[in-house]
Amino acid sequence: MSVVVRHDWDRKELHALFALPFPELLHRAASVHRAHFDPAEVQVSTLLSVKTGGCPEDCAYCPQAQRYDTGVSAQKLMDTEDVVAKARQAKAAGASRFCMGAAWRSPKDRDIPKVAAMIREVKAMGLETCATLGMLDAGQARALKDAGLDYYNHNLDTAPDYYDSIIHTRQYQDRLNTLEHVRDVGLKTCCGGIVGMGETREHRVGLLHALATLPAHPDSVPINQLVQVPGTPLHGTEPLDAFEFVRMIAVARIAMPKSMVRLSAGREAMSDELQALCFLAGANSIFYGEKLLTTGNPDTERDQGLFQRLGLRPMQITVDAAEHDHPGTVHADITCGAACEHAA
């Protein structure tokens, strides 16, 4: 099957895909998936919060926002040796990438050397690295690239025309600017959003349209299901229909055929059957481990059991002799993390 990568999708086309009969949509998405990936392979990453809580932003979904009473207290940036110990555990459990998230609006310049040290140490272990630290300027993006960072996560969260219902402390253009800085220095991008925040299907179409018409498709696209945390404004929101979530995965796969599509936050509450439908619809990446920053995630044993039942296997790593890396660094074609639970 020949699949053309397009950047000129219009919303009517994407809306028409959403409206297809469910079996037809899954057939199309699975066909696109098979054209670019081994459908039996799923990329596995581990995510660690290296700086938890105390964020000054007002994202309505986030338990790390300091203005909400969620029981999450502000903590200082972790020491590098503690991060390395967690990375070592992740590698032993089978992860091929280690993702580091910090609850910042944007890092201060004094924080960058500390994060750079974490990146260098984790890469020296043979893991790929990703980070999500909030908004970056051009100089900060360059410093992270020079430290050896592989991917940077910065989500759009939702459609441009629903954004003001969720966030007021950061503009949509701010997110696009950070993505531009990241692309300009040659970092790979991880960018997706969250569904189940009270948005309509048209808003979900709008999010995918914004992602699929970026100058370059994100290398990985995390699709997060809202994790409702008491104390956040979105707690108590009507849950999204499970089939609508699968449709979101399927249309993302069709619109961005060469991107990794990741099941991110909210997977703990998903049945094995729902996850299987998502894999059939084109999802090919998950986070491994019992926690995503401050919210739960399926434990490793459950994921291993699900992989065995479905005949899936973790994506294998390859060697990439990139110029900024140390000789012998091990790489994998995989995805990245996020600064809050919604990769999220």
From Swiss-Prot:
InterPro entries: Aldolase_TIM, BATS_dom, Biotin_synth/BioAB, Biotin_synthase, Elp3/MiaA/NifB-like_rSAM, rSAM. It comes from the Bacteria. GO terms for biological process: biotin biosynthetic process. Its EC number is 2.8.1.6. PROSITE patterns: RADICAL_SAM (PS51918). It is an enzyme of class 2 (transferase). Pfam families: BATS (PF06968), Radical_SAM (PF04055). Its cofactor is [4Fe-4S] cluster; [2Fe-2S] cluster. [4Fe-4S] cluster binds at C55, C59, C62. Pathway: Cofactor biosynthesis; biotin biosynthesis; biotin from 7,8-diaminononanoate: step 2/2. Homodimer. Belongs to the radical SAM superfamily. Biotin synthase family. This is Biotin synthase. The lineage of its organism: Bacteria, Pseudomonadati, Pseudomonadota, Gammaproteobacteria, Lysobacterales. The gene is bioB.
